[in-house]
Each structure stands twice: as C-alpha cells, then as structure tokens.
Amino acid sequence: YWAQQRLRTAPSPDRIAEPPAAPPRSKTVPPAYEVYSAETEKAPKQPPANKAPKTRPEVAIIIDDLGYDRALAHKFIEMNTVLTISVLPDSPFLKSLVAAANQKGYEILLHLPMEPDEYPRIQPGPGALLMAMSPDELIAQLYHDLGQVPHLIGVNNHMGSRMTKDPPKLRQVFSVLKKEGLFFIDSRTTAETQCEPSARLLQVPFAESEVFIDHSTDPEFIRRQIKRLINRAKRQGYAIGIGHPHLITFQILQEALPELEKEVDLVPVSRVVKIPS
C-alpha cells in the first residue's frame, strides 16, 4: 500500500541505470556493525532559558538492524512498552516483523544501509547507498529500499560514517525523503556528520540519536547507557536511544522498564522529530 500510494513520484525506470549491487549477504547472517565511540555522541543540548520544561522528559528507543533474527525480534515486539522498530532492506523476515510491529502499534523505520569509512572492508549489506553511485543510481536504490517497507514513516542510517559526511549525497537522499513525507533520524556513526544541516536546507523533519545503548554487550555497560539516556532526557527534555537485537539488550531493557517508566515518558520517535532551525 505504501509503495502504491507514496512512490508515484519515483523516477522513471527507463532513465535510471541499475545501481551497483553491494556484495550479497547470506540470509542467515546477521548484519555487520560499525564501531562506535563516545566521540560520535553529541554533547547534551541545553533547553532555552525562557522555555518552560515539559512536565516529564521523553525518551524514544529505536531497535534497529532488524530483519534477520525473527525470534529475537519478536521478543522486542512483544514487550509491553513503546518502541520504534527499524528494519533492514532485503532482510528475510522484513514483512512479517513489520506486520507484527504495526499490529502492536509501533512506528516503523527503514534502517537504510549507507557506505561506511571502512568500505569495502566492512560491507553495509544489501540495499546500500554507495559513494560511487550516480545520482540516478542512488535515487533508484533508495526508492527500491523504501518501497519494501509497509507502514513506513521515517528512516535512520545503518553504518554510513562516510556518506553522512558528504553533503551532496545527503541532499540527494533528503530530497527523496522530503518528497515522500518521511523524516530522518541520524544514528551518528561519525562525529563529522552533515545530516542536520542537510535536513535544515531541505526542510526535512529530523532528530539524532543521543545514546547507543549496547555498542558493548556487557550488561553493566548497557545499564549505564540506559541511565545516561534518562539523564540526557531530563537535561534537555527528550532523548533518543538506539539498541540492537541482542538477547542481553532485550533482557536489560526489560529489567530497566520500571525505572524508565518512573523517570520518563517512553514515546514513539516521531514525537521528537522537527525541522531543524
């Protein structure tokens, strides 16, 4: 339905070259990860002095890299809370996971693979946007990826530490998102990201991740990151956290739900996006 209703503006196939394919990933192999560091996280924003704070801070939690481990994904989907689900294109369980998440009322994002600094040593996987693509190739690949995901309302980047530093490529991506009425969440895989100024230029609704919950899978680390997420939200009014489909992430998040719900309002990520000023 989404593809039929929203992709009517897709470029004509007869004028678009076939995009260069990233090397195929086995349908049984989960996605690779970029290595994140504290330097990719922005300093907390200070709320305006003359603006009254919200009654309660808001936290949006995105679980991304979904589409490969069906059983583990369903553990997150079946949690009795508010999450945002982000699925990888061309993943084997995309359709069934989106259907289950939508039935639960979760918002759905495309987890858009983009070229990392380490490419080609590290592959972003099927459906990736690559720096070598021409504008027509990139737009064709992007429409292919978007059209796979029913109930889609936004996009966040998978990897992308190279491409998110490149304003011309970002303008190509954001021009499509603007046309299709989608927002963008910057996963902040590089401290040099140019996503926010590009979103401002094209007036695309935007937000960025505040905390990676589980770039280490040590249980105590994940607990500390959840506390950081809460503290960020209290300091600036809202915060976005990104987690991944690890069993330990599910277990610690489930354990932390009472504290989260006591301290903050858990909200869908669309609640905290806005056009950058």
Identify the meaning behind each predicted range.
Residues 58-65, 126-137, 215-220:
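Active-site mouth loops of central-metabolism enzymes
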Residues 56-59, 81-83, 104-106, 150-153, ...:
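Short, well-ordered coil/turn segments that N-cap beta-strands
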Residues 135-226, 244-265, 271:
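Catalytic domains of cell-wall/extracellular-matrix polysaccharide-remodeling enzymes
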Residues 90-96, 131-140:
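Glycine-rich anion/phosphate-binding loops
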Residues 64, 155, 240:
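Conserved, mostly hydrophobic/aromatic
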Residues 51-123:
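Active-site beta->alpha N-cap acidic-glycine motif
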Residues 1-57, 226:
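Terminal interaction modules at protein C-ends
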Residues 269-277:
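Short, flexible loop segments at boundaries between secondary-structure elements
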